[in-house]
Curated annotation (Swiss-Prot):
Participates in transcription elongation, termination and antitermination. It comes from Chlamydia pneumoniae. InterPro entries: KOW, NGN, NGN-like_dom, NGN_dom_sf, NusG-like, Rib_uL2_dom2, Transcrpt_antiterm_NusG, Translation_prot_SH3-like_sf. The keyword Transport does not apply. Changing T140M: In strain: CWL029 and TW-183. GO terms for biological process: DNA-templated transcription termination; regulation of DNA-templated transcription elongation; transcription antitermination; transcription elongation-coupled chromatin remodeling. Keywords: Transcription, Transcription antitermination, Transcription regulation, Transcription termination. Pfam families: NusG. GO terms for cellular component: cytosol. Belongs to the NusG family. PANTHER family: RHO-INTERACTING TRANSCRIPTION TERMINATION FACTOR NUSG (PTHR30265), TRANSCRIPTION TERMINATION_ANTITERMINATION PROTEIN NUSG (PTHR30265:SF2). This is Transcription termination/antitermination protein NusG.
Length: 182
């Protein structure tokens, strides 16, 4: 019976390991044991220096999903593929439950169908400025221009609210609650 397993691979080698696993599967007659290999990715829109660029990002860096019939032979085959670290579960691979599989596959399909905005800043969000004259200042987002990849932030300078305009998304980061020390 085929079940889904999560396999840890070397980070930044996910595509290479997936291809090696697929090629080796075909050449070594393991097609009856390994049904499908998925590398969960999503398309992310990044804006840097005013340019929009769609890039592929791994949903789970360092992991592949493998649908397989687990036997000693198939386990050893996958485990010995170059770039594979281990099965989730360690010494004894643990299959994903049906609910987990359904949730994961639905999530992957939803992310395949569109492009995700990398930065999801909203008016009222607290951010820290990481670049420019106001580096390390923490403020509140007052305007967001998603089409340009820019925003405006209100910061407190000598007790007075001052607007910092034309910041690019990459120049700020969201501040977690409790992390604010102006």
């Amino acid at each position: 019976m085929y079940k889904w397993y999560v396999v840890q691979v070397f980070t930044a080698q996910e595509k290479k390991v997936k291809k090696a696993l697929e090629d080796f599967k075909e050449s070594s007659g393991m097609t009856d044991f390994i049904q499908e290999i998925i590398l969960p990715i999503e398309n992310v829109m990044e804006v840097k220096k005013g340019e929009h660029k769609v890039v592929e990002k791994y949903i789970w860096p360092g992991y592949l999903l493998v649908k397989m019939h687990l036997t000693d032979e198939s386990w050893l085959y996958v485990k010995s593929t170059a770039g594979i670290v281990e099965f989730l579960g360690g010494g004894v691979p643990v299959a994903l439950s049906e609910d987990e599989v359904r949730s994961i596959l639905t999530d992957i399909e939803e992310k395949k169908s569109g492009v995700v905005q990398k930065h999801q800043f909203e008016v009222g969000s607290r951010v820290k400025i990481n670049d420019g004259v106001f580096v390390n200042f923490i403020g509140t987002v007052s305007e967001v221009f998603h089409d340009k990849g820019r925003l405006s932030v209100m910061v407190s300078i000598f007790g007075r609210e001052t607007r910092v305009d034309d910041l690019e998304f990459w120049q700020v980061e969201e501040v977690a609650p409790g992390q604010e020390s102006e």
